[in-house]
Every structure is written in C-alpha cells, then in structure tokens.
Regions:
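Conserved alpha-helix/loop element of class I SAM-dependent methyltransferases that forms part
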Residues: 1-16
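S-adenosyl-L-methionine-dependent methyltransferase catalytic module, highlighting the catalytic core
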Residues: 95-99, 106-201, 206-215
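Class I SAM-dependent methyltransferase SAM/SAH-binding core
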Residues: 32-60, 65-69
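Short conserved loop adjoining the S-adenosyl-L-methionine
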Residues: 69-75
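Glycine-rich SAM-binding Motif I of class I
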Residues: 27-31
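Class I SAM-dependent methyltransferase "Motif I" SAM/SAH-binding loop
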Residues: 23-25
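A short SAM/SAH-binding and catalytic strip from SAM-dependent methyltransferases
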Residues: 80-91
Length: 215
C-alpha cells in the first residue's frame, strides 16, 4: 500500500479517537496511531502469527475474520473504522460497510484502482489479467475478490447511502489530483453515512432488540 495512504489517514483521525482496524496485519500502523495520535485502538485479524505480532506491540487485537469480528462490538463503539488494504478481499463489502457504520461513526477505506492507465494497457495490448505495483499478485494468487475503479467506488457509495467526504489518490510519483480515475493506482476515502443509511441501521437495531425481547 502506498505510504501516502497511511500519512493521509493519520491526518484524518483526530487525537484521542476510538479506532477499530479491520485486518490489522502485524499491527504496525495501529501502533503508530496509538503512539502519534494517542488513539484508543483495537484490531481484528484472522492470522494467528500476525495477532501474536500485534500482542507483542501491546495492542488489543481479536483473532477473527472481519465479518465475525464486527459482531462482538456494540453500537457506536468507535469513532473510526479502518479497512486499509482489505476492502477488495471482502466477500460481501456492502454488508461489512453497513456493519462498520453500526459500530463506528466514520469509515476509512483504501483500495486499488482497476482503471489505472497501466491496467488498461495490459488488458488492451496483452489481453491478460494485469499485474501492477498496486496489484502485484497474478490472478490465481491474489486475495482480491473485487476489482473496481474510483468511479465504481463512488457508485457503490451512492447505492449504499454513503457520502465520500474526503479522498486522496496516489501513484508511484505521489499524490494524484488530475484525472485520478485514469492516473491513480490507489485511493483512500473517508466515508460518512447519510440520513437514509443511518435510518436503516437504526431500524435494524430496533428490530434486533424486539427479537431479543421476544426470546
């Protein structure tokens, strides 16, 4: 992942925020958030070896996949939920985003841009699934399940009822502001739920409480 993404997320998250990092990895970035932004941070990671690395860093990390990991948190438990480098690996990204907004106020998502000029060129001239700096693994070894462009992600947010309040795009040369869907290799977006999604989540919470009372 481009280092500019990490620097951007550091700027977006205020000090002393409550942060949940989904797909924590070895915990290096979450530890940096704790140290530099003084956040209260927790993580979810399914790889036991990586969880052990997180524990060595003094982090609170739960071993679970992302879908099951979110179930253990109550409503509005966090200010920010992070999906950095894991969004395209999700089986049901819309469901995870909705659940992330249940437990958090804002969601930060990073993803690779499948409409980058090099990706287009490899498909057009080579007729093969592209391999690039941001998509380094061949199709049979990649963890990615979804291949999307910046425009696709914008449409996804609109369909889901989510506002993209900020976005930063990057390629090998640095930040990209002009023609990002064509020139950017990676992007990170700051998301907020609009009133429609917020109402839907609130209704679902109410229905869940009713079912609990009936039991």
């Amino acid at each position: 992942m481009h280092p500019g993404i990490y620097e951007t997320v550091l700027r977006w998250i205020p000090e002393k925020s409550r942060v949940l990092d989904l797909g924590t990895g070895d915990g290096a970035f979450l530890a940096r958030l704790v140290q530099t932004r003084r956040v209260t941070g927790e993580g979810v990671e399914k790889d036991s070896a990586l969880v052990a690395r997180c524990v060595e860093r003094g982090l609170t990390v739960h071993q679970s996949d992302i879908a099951d990991g979110l179930d253990q948190y109550g409503d509005n438990a966090f200010d920010f939920v992070l999906l950095l480098g894991t969004f395209q690996e999700l089986i049901s990204p819309a469901e995870i985003i909705r659940e992330a907004f249940r437990v958090g106020r804002e969601v930060i998502v990073s993803y690779s841009n499948f409409a980058h000029v090099r990706v287009r060129a490899q498909i057009l001239f080579q007729g093969r699934t592209p391999v690039t700096r941001s998509l380094p693994a061949p199709w049979y070894r990649t963890h990615n399940l979804h291949f999307l462009s910046l425009l696709d992600f914008q449409e996804f947010c609109r369909d889901l009822g989510v506002r993209e309040t900020n976005r930063a795009c990057f390629n090998a040369r640095g930040a990209v502001r002009f023609l990002p869907n064509f020139r950017a290799e990676e992007a990170v977006s700051l998301l907020q739920a609009n009133s429609i999604l917020s109402h839907s989540i609130t209704v679902e919470r109410g229905e869940a409480k009713k079912e609990t009372y009936q039991i």
